[in-house]
């Protein structure tokens, strides 16, 4: 059995390491995610239905129903969602990932990222920027207006530029950003700048969106976290390439919906193993405390699943203070500790100040259970009430219960063959 597992893990690692994510389009979700039809919304994390959703996610669902035009008021939207008239599905089941509440609706534009090695695609919404945003559960008229601007103005300009460029290779940008101090979860300053540098010439050359070009460029340069969603889609395309390999103990997804935390492993495909989401530990913005916080949420842990975020914190000194990690020595300790539960180091994503060693990559279910070391995740902290927004940033841990469940299921699966 061990040989089978080792061979399976090597195959999964090869698929993950060889993934070549390229931004090939920016399109309405329903145009590229054909199963996302009328009456369906996607959300972050493992499956969860309306009654069990946390307040920020319920707020985002209400906002998406208004944005989509399926409800005219918050009351109508809440009645639709609570009455079962809307199908609420996990974004992961559609090869998609979304930050925080992670809500997708059919009209929302998405980044289309293709793994050119195997041909699979992954999707993520466009980052809304700062302030009052749907990913934290806000749903008033200003939020809807911004989403419609993204749909009608920003997305068409980006689509035209991406198609004119023939696609944007993301892996080289991510490698360079990592060398410049981003861990690509809570810090994307370099990655966003590099992306803008790559796309700007194509935005300004013959764009049909010339009248709104200044708005588009102002939005891009004013949002240091813009690249987050691109990094998430890139990571999803790599992890999906490593999924559904018989015998593999590689963790292919970690995700949270604000109520439950879920993981998937290579050998068991799309099956979720869940436990209650834990509270992040970190720093709170002035006026807020842990009493205001919602349990951990979002699909952005796909970055740690690949080896970025908290796993790469040794290469991102600037993020240490923001997430309350302590000193640089503490950040180094996080990266080294994560190396104890991974199968290798990513050959294309390296940390310069660790002699260009690759980030620890490929979380091994067996090592997590054997060591008792839980994967660490850099994360934003959402207010527990919809619409109040982000109240801090910190580090969350994956609940070990998920991994014990998965190992037991894997043993039962292999013994039954």
Name what the model sees in each region:
Residues 1-417:
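Anaerobic metallocofactor- and corrinoid-dependent redox/one-carbon enzyme cores
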């Amino acid at each position: 059995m061990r040989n089978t597992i080792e061979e399976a893990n090597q195959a999964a690692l090869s698929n993950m390491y060889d993934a070549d994510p390229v931004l090939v389009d920016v399109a309405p979700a329903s145009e590229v995610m054909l199963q996302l039809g009328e009456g369906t919304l996607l959300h972050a994390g493992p499956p969860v239905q309306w009654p069990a959703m946390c307040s920020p996610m319920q707020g985002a669902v209400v906002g998406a129903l208004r944005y989509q035009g399926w409800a005219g008021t918050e009351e109508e939207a809440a009645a639709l969602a609570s009455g079962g008239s809307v199908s609420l599905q996990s974004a992961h089941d559609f090869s998609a990932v979304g930050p925080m509440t992670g809500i997708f609706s059919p009209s929302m534009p998405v980044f289309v990222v293709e793994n050119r090695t195997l041909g699979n695609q992954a999707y993520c919404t466009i980052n809304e920027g700062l302030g009052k945003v749907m990913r934290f559960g806000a749903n008033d008229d200003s939020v809807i207006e911004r989403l419609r601007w993204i749909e009608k103005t920003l997305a068409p300009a980006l689509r035209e530029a991406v198609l004119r460029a023939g696609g944007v290779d993301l892996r080289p940008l991510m490698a360079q950003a990592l060398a410049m101090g981003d861990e690509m979860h809570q810090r994307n300053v370099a990655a966003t700048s590099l992306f803008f540098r790559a796309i700007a010439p194509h935005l300004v050359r013959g764009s049909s969106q010339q009248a709104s070009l200044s708005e588009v460029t102002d939005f891009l340069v004013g949002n240091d976290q813009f690249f987050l969603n691109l990094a998430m889609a890139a990571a999803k395309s790599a992890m999906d390439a490593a999924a559904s390999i018989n015998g593999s103990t590689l963790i292919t997804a970690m995700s949270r919906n604000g109520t439950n935390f879920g993981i998937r492993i290579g050998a068991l495909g799309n099956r979720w193993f869940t436990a209650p989401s834990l509270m992040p530990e970190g720093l709170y913005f002035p006026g807020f405390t842990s009493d205001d916080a919602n349990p951990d949420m979002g699909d952005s842990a796909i970055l740690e699943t690949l080896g970025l975020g908290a796993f790469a914190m040794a290469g991102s000194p600037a993020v240490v203070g923001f997430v309350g990690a302590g000193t640089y020595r503490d950040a180094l300790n996080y990266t080294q500790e994560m190396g104890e539960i991974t199968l290798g180091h990513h050959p294309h994503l390296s940390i310069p100040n660790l002699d260009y060693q690759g980030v620890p990559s490929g979380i091994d279910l067996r090592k997590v259970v054997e060591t008792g070391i839980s994967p660490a995740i850099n994360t934003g902290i959402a207010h527990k009430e919809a619409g109040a927004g982000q109240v801090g940033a910190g580090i969350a841990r994956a609940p070990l219960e998920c991994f014990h469940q998965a190992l037991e299921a894997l043993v039962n699966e292999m013994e039954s063959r």
